[in-house]
């Protein structure tokens, strides 16, 4: 099998590439250049997508004895990931750019180019498992990345390979060291790769600009003014610009954002509880939608807990009714659907949260 190994320069993708070589596949390594603008992406070992990371990936490819290329995806990354990230926050939503990158860059643009060049699969260092076309959680629950892959279609998964999903992260580092890979102890990246400072609020403010509005309580009383709804997300407690807790002494949280009126509403923690979610841009990883209501477990954050629910496709929207309230759900978040399984929860699909109700 001809395999294109996506190599970020980190330990996970390096071991993934090595395992594909060991399996006897015809492997070619590729690093994605996602920006040419100074200061746009992280540099050094703290993040991904830098020149240093490209060099690390090349050195690993040399050790493995495979061809290596750097492909320029900067323009598409800007349009499909960064610009959409900015637009979503301007709409008062809370997107996950890693989800968007997987859906539109790694397993769409990159995968399409790979297939056009005669490759059978794109292998990445994601912590997830594929078995019989079914996407499952990784063995290492703490590192599991199935959530950010739940947006992938059956066709996208058909050309994907996740060689390290059956191994805990500490063992991946040990394996890299045994193989003599210099990235064995390279730190993991945790922040958004295109925000060098790690300050998302400042990044958004510089690019979206000022659109002043009001912070109000449940009664509509104006508590403060703000410079733009992009500085807030549902469940936020700090940085609200208001003078301390409510009259009853309880902390106040962002409970709703109206981008049309630039209004941010705050309330108590209990106001964050939701029992129903509405999803758009629905994807079922099998390629076939269930014919009626179905039991599932849902997850709304990359490393969040799952909650039992009943979901149903109504037209082109997904209605999800929770068995118990879920707190702090924000429009724009990815809603991943799972089928519980002791051998590793299976991903059923996903949707983008369009609205919630209590």
Curated annotation (Swiss-Prot):
Its main location: cytoplasm. SUPFAM superfamilies: Adenine nucleotide alpha hydrolases-like. The active site is at residues 101, 193. The keyword Ion transport does not apply. The keyword Chloroplast does not apply. InterPro entries: MnmA-like (IPR004506), MnmA-like_C (IPR046885), MnmA-like_central (IPR046884), MnmA-like_central_sf (IPR023382), Rossmann-like_a/b/a_fold (IPR014729). This is tRNA-specific 2-thiouridylase MnmA. The gene is mnmA.
């Amino acid at each position: 099998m001809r395999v294109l190994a996506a190599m970020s320069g980190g330990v996970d993708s390096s071991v993934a590439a090595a395992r594909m070589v060991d399996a006897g596949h015809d492997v070619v390594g590729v690093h994605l250049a996602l920006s040419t603008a100074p200061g746009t992406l992280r540099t050094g070992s703290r993040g991904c997508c830098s020149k240093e990371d490209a060099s690390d990936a090349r050195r690993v490819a040399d050790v493995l004895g495979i061809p290596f290329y750097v492909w320029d995806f900067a323009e598409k990354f800007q349009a499909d990931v960064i610009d959409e990230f900015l637009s979503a926050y301007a709409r008062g939503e809370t997107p996950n750019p890693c989800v968007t990158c997987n859906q539109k860059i790694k397993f769409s643009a990159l995968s399409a180019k790979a297939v056009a060049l005669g490759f059978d699969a794109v292998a990445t260092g994601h912590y997830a498992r594929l078995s019989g076309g079914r996407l499952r959680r990784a063995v290492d629950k703490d590192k599991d990345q199935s959530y950010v892959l739940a947006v992938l279609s059956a066709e996208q998964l058909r050309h994907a390979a996740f060689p390290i999903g059956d191994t805990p992260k500490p063992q991946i580092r040990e394996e890299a060291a045994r193989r003599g890979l210099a990235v064995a102890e390279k730190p993991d990246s945790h922040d958004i790769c295109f925000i060098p400072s790690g300050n998302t609020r400042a990044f958004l403010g510089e690019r979206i600009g000022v659109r002043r509005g009001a912070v109000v309580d449940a009664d509509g009383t104006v508590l403060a003014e703000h410079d733009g709804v992009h500085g807030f997300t549902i469940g936020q407690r700090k940085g609200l610009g208001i003078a301390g807790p409510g009259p009853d002494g309880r902390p106040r949280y962002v409970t709703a954002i109206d981008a049309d009126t630039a209004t941010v509403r705050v309330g108590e923690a209990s106001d964050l509880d939701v029992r129903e979610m509405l999803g758009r841009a629905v994807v079922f990883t099998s390629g076939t939608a269930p014919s009626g209501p179905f039991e599932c477990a849902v997850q709304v954050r990359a490393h969040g807990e799952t909650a039992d629910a009943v979901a149903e496709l109504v037209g082109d929207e997904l209605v999800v009714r929770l068995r118990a309230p879920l707190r702090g759900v924000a429009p724009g978040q990815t809603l991943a659907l799972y089928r519980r399984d002791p051998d590793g929860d299976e991903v059923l699909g996903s949707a983008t949260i369009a609205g919630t109700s209590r």
